[in-house]
């Protein structure tokens, strides 16, 4: 699971649909958007929003669970800078697999809007079983009551009960090392949905396997993909060493 702040980046050339609709593609093929989960300080966002490939989306976390107890001026400035560059910012909220009180998550949603002007949310440590469907329906309904156009991302890290697809704009359906990704089995029902409803996070990827990982994600119907060579306790504490090449590879896969 993504344990703390997450930065999700999509190359500006790849116009993602905020509500999770089909990403534009060529010849009827689904397009991929590159996203980055990252434990970045506000200063660390500079590289991500600088250059020709401006991010499409960032997911913001202030603490290890959500918006925190007070606004952080440095993050407020970072959000404003990102939004001014055309970036959509989402707030991060930990759900502890459905064990965190819904009222606490809803308070995070209120704080993100009031303090940062952010209404779309990523619900991390999401449950996968049918027993928590009501919990996530409630949260998604609340998020969309705050802003009907808000995106709701769920991160269970694996494929959930299919009924979660009606709740989420995007489901992070894989989070793990490349060694495990090469053996991933995708449920047959996945092909019934737009690729833009699925995201895959692949870490500990050798540079020589970057193109392979992106190609595998495309073949597995993932419209959002993040690949990093980082590993260890926190593989998200910086951009991948091959980040410029990753952006270019994803863009070529989309438009080529």
Regions from the PLM with identified roles:
Residues 8-9, 14-17:
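Hydrophobic alpha-helical segments of integral membrane proteins
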Residues 1-7:
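N-terminal export and membrane-targeting signals
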Residues 3, 17, 21-256:
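Glycan-processing catalytic domains of CAZymes
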């Amino acid at each position: 699971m993504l344990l703390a702040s997450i930065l999700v980046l999509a190359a500006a050339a790849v116009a993602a649909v905020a509500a999770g609709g089909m990403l534009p593609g060529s010849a009827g093929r689904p397009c991929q958007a590159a996203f980055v989960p990252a434990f970045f300080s506000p200063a660390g966002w500079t590289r991500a929003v600088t250059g020709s490939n401006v991010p499409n989306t960032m997911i913001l976390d202030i603490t290890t669970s959500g918006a925190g107890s007070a606004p952080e001026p440095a993050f407020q400035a970072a959000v404003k800078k990102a939004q001014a560059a055309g970036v959509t910012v989402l707030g991060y909220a930990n759900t502890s697999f459905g064990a965190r009180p819904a009222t606490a998550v809803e308070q995070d949603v209120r704080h993100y809007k009031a303090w940062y002007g952010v209404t779309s949310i990523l619900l991390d440590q999401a449950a996968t079983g049918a027993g928590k469907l009501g919990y996530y329906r409630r949260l998604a309904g609340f998020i969309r009551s705050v802003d009907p156009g808000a995106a709701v991302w769920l991160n269970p890290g694996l494929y959930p009960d299919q009924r979660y697809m009606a709740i989420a704009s995007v489901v992070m359906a894989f989070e793990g090392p490349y060694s495990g990704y090469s053996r991933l089995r995708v449920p047959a029902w996945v092909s019934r949905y737009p690729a833009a409803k699925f995201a895959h996070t692949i870490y500990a990827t050798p540079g020589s396997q970057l193109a392979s990982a992106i190609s595998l994600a495309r073949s597995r119907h993932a419209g959002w993909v993040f690949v990093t060579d980082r590993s260890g306790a926190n593989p998200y504490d910086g951009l991948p060493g091959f980040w410029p090449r990753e952006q270019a590879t994803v863009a070529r896969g989309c438009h080529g």
